[in-house]
């Protein structure tokens, strides 16, 4: 019957929209128009979230949840090459783009390299830019890992998603030109609103080692 044909075409159209990321389906609720995902460069250039979004004409605003000096745990000390218990600046921020919460990030830096950082307002300021202008600390390279994780109840509430919703966990260590680690951060991006771009290059075998230096 004509109705069945129309229904088949309609369903196929919805599937096509889902594949293109233009719609999303939730069990028990139906199909909705999806918000376009924010594109972020992951490996081709080392920029912070603020610089990345500001460069697209959408500068983020941060709600600073925690900003303090704490003793480094063994894990944080390992990333920053400090002794456990050494003082680090800890900053937790919920980052908004166009009024929507998109990223929950915890950042750790050696307190000795950036005195007074715990008192700086980062609501609408780039951390990387401030490190460069206030302390002469210019980040030269970084190492990032990416994985999918479910949102905890706390994370879901802050990011306005359901508990268990997929988040993209980005772990990063940033280094100065002399190889000293200056920042470790742990960022949770909303899976429904984030899209990362990766640029790959082909190199000769004897050049691979230099990329990991």
Across the structure, where does each feature detected by a protein language model lie?
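N-terminal helix-turn-helix
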Residues: 1-33
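All-alpha effector-binding/dimerization core of bacterial HTH-type transcriptional repressors
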Residues: 35-213
């Amino acid at each position: 019957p004509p109705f069945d044909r129309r229904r088949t075409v309609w369903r196929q159209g919805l599937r096509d929209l889902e594949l293109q990321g233009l719609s999303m389906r939730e069990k028990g609720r139906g199909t909705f128009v999806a918000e376009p995902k924010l594109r972020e460069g992951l490996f081709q250039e080392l920029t912070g979230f603020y610089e990345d979004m500001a460069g697209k004409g959408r500068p983020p605003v941060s709600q600073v949840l925690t900003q303090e000096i704490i003793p480094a745990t063994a894990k944080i000390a390992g990333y920053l090459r400090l002794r456990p218990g050494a003082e680090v600046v800890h900053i937790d921020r919920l980052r908004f783009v166009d009024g929507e919460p998109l990223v929950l990030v915890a950042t750790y830096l050696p307190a000795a390299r950036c005195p007074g950082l715990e008192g700086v307002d980062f609501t609408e300021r780039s951390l990387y830019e401030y490190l460069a202008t206030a302390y002469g600390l210019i980040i030269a390279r970084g190492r990032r890992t990416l994985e999918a994780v479910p949102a905890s109840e706390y994370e879901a509430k802050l990011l306005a998603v359901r508990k268990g919703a997929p988040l993209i966990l980005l772990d990063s260590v940033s280094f100065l030109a002399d190889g000293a680690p200056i920042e470790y951060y742990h960022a949770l991006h909303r899976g429904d609103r984030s899209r990362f771009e990766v640029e790959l290059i082909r190199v000769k075998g004897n050049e691979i080692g230099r990329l990991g230096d």
